[in-house]
Each structure stands twice: as C-alpha cells, then as structure tokens.
Amino acid sequence: MLWTDCLTRLRQELSDNVFAMWIRPLVAEEVEGILRLYAPNPYWTRYIQENHLELISILAEQLSEGRVRQVEILVDSRPGSILSSSEQPATTTAALQTAPIPQPAKVKREPEPVANTAVSSKSSKKKLLNPQFTFSLFVEGRSNQMAAETCRKVLTQLGASQHNPLFLYGPTGLGKTHLMQAVGNALLQAKPNARVMYMTSESFVQDFVSSLQKGKVEEFKKNCRSLDLLLVDDIHLLAGKEASLVEFFYTFNALLDESKQIILTSDRYPKELTELDPRLVSRFSWGLSVGVEPPDIETRIEILLKKAENSGVDLPRNCALFIAQQVVANVRELEGALNKVVAISRFKGAPIDLDVVRESLKDVLAIRARTISVENIQRVVSEYFRIPLKELVGPKRTRIYARPRQLAMGLARELTGDSFPEIGMAFGGRDHSTVMHACEKVVSLREEDPIFDEDYKNLLRLLQS
C-alpha cells in the first residue's frame, strides 16, 4: 500500500518522537489520484500542513510513480473515526484554549519530561544544562565582554527590573547559549534547590503540544511558571507557532509579575523580530538587550588556547594564531577547526605544528584564497571610504588616506594568512615594522574611537559576507 511505503520513508527522514507523535496516527486513503490523510483535529492538520505536507507530497508522487499528484490533510469526521464531527471544536483557537487534544488510539508512547529542564539536584528530571558552559570556561574579549559582565550581574540581582528580561542577541555560534547556561549553572551551584529551566524555542513548542495531546496542559503551565530562572534559546523561532506564542506570552507575563528572571537569545535585536507578536517584542525590550559580536583575532587566539588546554592538547601559540587568521566567522567554526587539527595530529602521530595545521585546514585555505585576499580588502576599503585605490596603497600620509590604510592593514592581518612583510609589499612595498605599527594602531583606535570601531566592524561584515 502506498501509505505504508510512505511511512517507511518518513520513519527514516523524521525523528522517532515526531514520527510516533504526529505521523503514525494518521489514517490514509487513496481516491482518484489523491492521497487523503485524516488527523484527529484541526490543530493536528495545521501542524502537518506547516511542517510535513511538502515532504509527504514528494514521497507520495515518487513512490506511486506519478499516480498520486496531490496530498490532502483533513480532520477525520467520518463515522466511527477517532474524532467524529459532533466532537470537533468550533475553531482551532478555541480547541487550544478549552480542551486538550484527544490521544489517538493505538499509539503507545513512553512518558516524557514536560520540558528540557535543569532543576534542583533532588528532582528526577533530566538536567540538560551543559556542565562545560560556565563563566570560568568562557573566554572574554571586546566582542562579548558586556554580555558576560551583564550575565554575572544578573546572578547578584536575580529578577531585577533593569535586566529582566535579559535579551542576548547576535549571529549564531558566538557563545550566547554558553553565557545563558553559565547563569543557570552558577545559580544551581549557589542554590541547589533553585528551579531553573533551559529550553530552545523548538522544545517549548514540542513540549507544549505534547502536553495538549496528553491532557497535561496545567502541569506544563505549572512547571513553566514556578521557576526562579527561565532560559530560552532562539526565541525568534517561535514565529508562526500561534498557539505556542500565546502560551509563552502568558508564561512570560506570569514570571515577570513574580520578579522571576528570564534570559532569552536571538539572532537579532528585539525590534527587528517583526514576525513575532508586537506585544511580545515590546516586552522583550522591558529589560536589557545586549549584543554579542564575532570575536576579534586576539579573542579567537585565546579561545583556541583555552580549548586546547582544557582538552589536554599542546597547541603552540603560532598555530593558534594561524587558525585564528583563517577561521573568523564564529566560535563554533573555530572549535571545529581545532578539533580537525587535533584529529589529523593524532592520526599522523605527530605534534601540532604549522605543517599539520595547514594540512588540516587545506579546504578552508582554498576557499579563503578565492574569497579574501589583501587585494580584495584594499578594493573594499577604498570603495567604503570613496578614495582612489592608488592613494590607499600610495605614500601620502594625510589623515584621509592614512586611517583607511591602517584599517586595511589591520583587516589584512586579521583575515588573511599573510605575514607582515607580505602585507607590506601589497601596500606599496612598506616594511614589516610599518604594518606592525598599523595593526597596533588599529587595536588602540578601536578602543578610543567609536566611529573607527564601527567602520572596522562594517568592513569586517562586508568582507565576511
């Protein structure tokens, strides 16, 4: 039967939990080239439409060899079905607010925790805070220092209105999850009986839906609203999850009313989350929003050295510098590069040196050679400041050319693997000491001059995009 074949493929494509909870209970029939799937209620049909109908349609057409060209998902109102028409709620929203979704027949599932939770040591629930995500293992630099200091301050003033909620934002892989979980780990260490819950937006949705299906909505609400600290990762991914957004809105308000601390992360500043309910976005701005930026080269070096030290790996500083020059996007990629270097070193039975590093990162080096070069940096900087390229690399020392030139040299040192002499040659044959001085000047100017620092960040984004 076509649906049986589809189920076999869907089991391979989807997680066991999603397959058992959402796909297996569906009833199917094929009518004149249409595969009709029946779900117990409107909420179920909407979930399938939004998340899995496209995949099911592709599989149905492939496995039927073109016989089936359309897949429909309907509420099962047939006589004797799981949910007869007389039992259907008037609207999806009403169903969500007034009644749990009935448990489909023939589906047997093991009990699950209501949420991804870290609570006191006396709790039987699984502790999902990463024990490695502590303040002592977090490497601070200019790009994340304010966020780290704010998180420490939250611990001393838990629930204080000036930083509740605390909203950490920035691109993926920069340590936002590490910082928020560091707060949770530190709180549990100081107060073992504190109630701390960490979850992603996805797990919040899954756990909320699961509670609806099992008739345990009140238990879910109680767990979420009786906390001392709620940590939610990637809050922007709640977009489009209407019922879950409503529940999160009430949970958010309940915790704030009790002065319980909330920490959220997102890839964007709160007011840029235009796809979320404006009321919720407004509440995100009630406390304190702190950005986390890509680490500069000094911070990247320290991250590598600390990671190596904690792993018992001997990483020479010149090798850390080389890796940091090649991998600039985020901390996650940086750690991935180090893991690859360590793996190659162990495979060859050789200590880590520049030859091992170059061999390990040859794919990265090949890509960067095609994308970021000193010449490319010079072109982008000259266009950004609207100055002729010949003046950028020329001998004139007037401020209008000197500052962009220093900035370009600093970027070249950070983004390419070129040495000081090589960079100097690309800038009109200047010697290595001139380039070294320019790079040192860039570091000090970024600390002293906010406009210069902003120009540096803008160019960094342009070159990395």
Swiss-Prot record:
Compartments where found: Cytoplasm
Region (Disordered): 81-123
A Pfam match: Bac_DnaA_C
Record region (Domain IV, binds dsDNA): 346-465
Region described as Domain II: spans on this chain: 88-127
Protein family (similarity comment): Belongs to the DnaA family.
Transmembrane segments: none
GO CC list: cytoplasm; plasma membrane
Domain I, interacts with DnaA modulators as annotated region, ranges: 1-87
Region entry Domain III, AAA+ region, spans: 128-345
Sample GO molecular function, one term: lipid binding
Domain notes: Domain I is involved in oligomerization and binding regulators, domain II is flexibile and of varying length in different bacteria, domain III forms the AAA+ region, while domain IV binds dsDNA.
GO BP terms, alphabetized: DNA replication initiation; regulation of DNA replication
InterPro entries xref list: AAA+_ATPase, Chromosome_initiator_DnaA, Chromosome_initiator_DnaA-like, Chromosome_initiator_DnaA_CS, DnaA_C, DnaA_dom, DnaA_N_dom, DnaA_N_sf
Role, per record: Plays an essential role in the initiation and regulation of chromosomal replication. ATP-DnaA binds to the origin of replication (oriC) to initiate formation of the DNA replication initiation complex once per cell cycle. Binds the DnaA box (a 9 base pair repeat at the origin) and separates the double-stranded (ds)DNA. Forms a right-handed helical filament on oriC DNA; dsDNA binds to the exterior of the filament while single-stranded (ss)DNA is stabiized in the filament's interior.
UniProt organism field: Acinetobacter baumannii (strain AYE)
Main location class: cytoplasm
The name this protein goes by in its record: Chromosomal replication initiator protein DnaA
Keyword field: ATP-binding, Cytoplasm, DNA replication, DNA-binding, Lipid-binding, Nucleotide-binding
Keyword Ribosomal protein on entry: no
Bias (Low complexity) ranges: 88-100
Gene, per the UniProt record: dnaA
Record carries keyword Hydrolase: no
Binding site for ATP: G173, G175, K176, T177
Oligomer and partners: Oligomerizes as a right-handed, spiral filament on DNA at oriC.
PANTHER family in alphabetical order: CHROMOSOMAL REPLICATION INITIATOR PROTEIN DNAA
